[in-house]
C-alpha cells in the first residue's frame, strides 16, 4: 500500500519534476492509499507529517469516503510554507494570510525555486480545503493552537493535547546508583535553528548542570 519513494534531493531534471508533482498533487499516492482504505476500512485516519512524501491528498481521499480525519501538527507548515515561522533568524508571520511572502523573502532554503514550489504547494493545499477535509487538528501546545486560530483556522477544529510520556517505566528502571550521579540533562533531536538549540546552549552556560546533546542537522558544525 506504500506510495513509491521519491528522492527529494535528486539533482536530475526528471527527479525534480517527480518531486514537484508529488508535493503539488500527490502524484503516485492516490491509488495506493485508496487501496489501503478499501482493505482496512478505518473509522478514523490519523495524519502526521504528511507533506511532501504523501501530501494532503490523503486527507481528501479519506474525507471523500466519509472517514473521520484527525491531523496532529508537529510544526507550522499550515501557516508557514517554510514550516518554522522564521525568516533570517527572526520570528515571521507574514505568510499567515499572504503566502507569496515566502517567494519575496526566499524563506525555503534561501532558494527562489524552492520558495516558489513552497508557495504553489500552500496555494494548492490551502486552508479552506484542509479545514473541509480535516475534522480535528491536534496541537501539542496552547501557543500553537492560538497561532492556528490567529491564522484563520476555526477554534472548533482545534484540540490541545500536549506531548506526553509515561513515567512508570522510567521510575521502575532507575538504578539507585545512577540516580546518585551528577545532575545533568540531555537534548536529543535535530540540530537546527527552529529547535532553539542555540538558546539552550546559552542557558546551559548559566546552570551548574551538565548538558548532553545528541543529534545532527545544519547547525552541527557550528555547535561542535
What does each model-found stretch correspond to?
Residues 31, 64-65, 77, 92-137, ...:
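Membrane-proximal helix-turn-helix segments that form the acceptor-binding/catalytic region
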Amino acid at each position: 500500500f506504500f506510495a513509491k519513494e521519491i528522492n527529494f534531493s535528486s539533482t536530475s531534471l526528471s527527479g525534480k519534476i517527480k518531486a514537484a508533482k508529488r508535493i503539488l498533487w500527490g502524484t503516485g499516492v492516490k491509488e495506493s492509499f485508496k487501496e489501503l482504505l478499501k482493505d482496512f476500512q478505518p473509522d478514523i485516519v490519523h495524519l502526521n507529517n504528511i507533506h511532501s512524501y504523501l501530501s494532503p491528498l490523503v486527507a481528501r481521499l479519506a474525507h471523500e469516503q466519509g472517514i473521520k480525519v484527525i491531523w496532529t501538527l508537529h510544526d507550522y507548515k499550515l501557516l508557514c510554507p517554510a514550516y518554522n515561522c522564521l525568516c533570517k533568524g527572526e520570528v515571521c508571520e507574514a505568510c499567515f494570510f499572504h503566502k507569496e511572502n515566502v517567494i519575496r523573502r526566499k524563506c525555503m532554503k534561501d532558494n527562489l525555486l524552492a520558495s516558489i514550489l513552497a508557495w504553489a504547494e500552500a496555494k494548492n493545499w490551502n486552508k479552506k480545503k484542509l479545514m473541509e477535509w480535516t475534522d480535528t487538528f491536534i496541537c501539542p501546545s496552547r501557543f500553537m493552537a492560538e497561532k492556528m486560530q490567529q491564522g484563520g483556522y476555526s477554534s472548533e477544529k482545534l484540540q490541545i493535547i500536549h506531548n506526553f510520556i509515561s513515567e512508570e517505566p522510567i521510575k521502575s528502571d532507575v538504578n539507585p546508583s545512577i540516580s546518585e550521579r551528577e545532575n545533568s540533562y540531555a537534548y536529543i533531536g535535530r540540530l537546527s535553528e527552529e529547535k532553539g538549540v542555540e538558546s539552550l546552549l546559552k542557558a546551559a552556560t548559566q546552570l551548574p548542570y551538565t548538558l548532553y546533546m545528541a543529534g545532527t542537522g545544519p547547525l552541527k558544525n557550528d555547535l561542535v
